[in-house]
UniProtKB/Swiss-Prot annotation:
Species of origin: Tropheryma whipplei (strain TW08/27) (Whipple's bacillus)
CDD domains: KPHMT-like (cd06557)
EC number: 2.1.2.11
UniProt keyword terms in alphabetical order: Cytoplasm, Magnesium, Metal-binding, Pantothenate biosynthesis, Transferase
Biological process (GO), any one: pantothenate biosynthetic process
Broad class of where this protein is predominantly found: cytoplasm
Stored PANTHER family: 3-METHYL-2-OXOBUTANOATE HYDROXYMETHYLTRANSFERASE
Cofactor(s) needed for function: Mg(2+)
Active site: E187 (proton acceptor)
Binding site for Mg(2+): D51, D90, E122
Protein name: 3-methyl-2-oxobutanoate hydroxymethyltransferase
Length: 269
């Protein structure tokens, strides 16, 4: 039986209303209790338990490989670590595309088993009916358009979106808004297109490599703190945590081998 989430968590969906904050919205991905506990004190507007966990946590080759239970286990830990944060959970590939009924069942299962605030799913006009069905069931939905990692094979690889398909992406943004989403992620979309969409739709736009003019910004925390193998162009590294961890481990190993650990104050009385 899963542990019930904290009843003290506050819903902050109003933060996503255009102009309600008077500033940019700021969010990061998060995948575990300990990191969530730290991020809960960083004045972020939201945390996303993204399907990017497929690679950075589970080591799969693409985001489409992660399954629902794997995401739910992570999300439940994040909610326990940051019970007062607005936490969004990605619906994994294959858990919502088939039908409105499946999409609603998956979204409700995620919310019930994790205590999260909302779900996110990929796709614009082609997934508008799924968004609408989930919203009607009472679950807030964040959309995701532009580059959609779950369908990378159909997109032909990692490519900037909007250079030759701007009209389609614009229509996707409108469809997501009309379906009832409270916000939409625009990933790897040209800055000009992201600016146009942001100025013309009424829901908040969250940029991931989409330039300066979106209503908010989102990054994968592993990229931000230097815990990723690959360096992402649109994600500057503010630290090199991989080097810090390696240095700590090597120093401790050295102390063990040289008889300097444990010291007296490391031994329980």
């Amino acid at each position: 039986m899963s542990r019930k989430p904290s009843p003290t968590r506050r819903t902050r969906i109003h933060r996503f209303h255009k102009g309600s904050c008077g500033r940019k919205l700021v969010g990061l991905t998060c995948y575990d209790f300990s990191t969530a506990r730290v991020l809960s004190d960083c004045e972020l507007d939201f945390l996303l338990v993204g399907d990017s966990a497929s690679g950075v946590i589970y080591g799969y080759e693409n985001t489409g490989s992660v399954c629902l239970d794997e995401i739910i286990y992570l999300a439940a830990g994040v909610v326990r670590g940051a019970p007062n944060s607005f936490i969004i959970v990605d619906l994994p590939f294959g858990t919502y595309e088939k039908s409105d009924e499946l999409a609603v069942e998956t979204a409700i299962e995620v919310i019930k088993r994790t205590g999260a605030s909302a779900v996110k799913l990929e796709g614009g006009a082609r997934m508008a009916c799924r968004i609408s069905a989930i919203v009607r069931a009472g679950v807030p939905v964040m959309g995701h358009i532009g580059f959609t990692p779950q369908t990378i094979n159909a997109l032909g690889g990692y490519k900037i979106q909007g250079r030759d398909n701007a009209d389609l992406i614009y229509l996707d943004a409108q469809a997501v808004e009309q379906a009832g989403a409270f916000a939409v992620v625009m990933e790897m979309v040209t800055e000009d297109l992201a600016k146009t969409i942001t100025s013309e739709i009424k829901i908040a736009t969250i940029g991931v490599g989409a330039g300066r003019y979106t209503d908010g910004q989102l990054l994968v925390i592993n990229d931000l703190i230097g815990l990723s193998e690959k360096k992402i162009t649109f994600a500057p590294r503010y630290a090199s945590i991989d080097n810090t961890v390696a240095s700590c481990v090597k120093l401790w190993r050295k102390d063990v081998l040289e008889g300097n650990f444990p010291q007296k104050d490391h031994i329980p009385a």
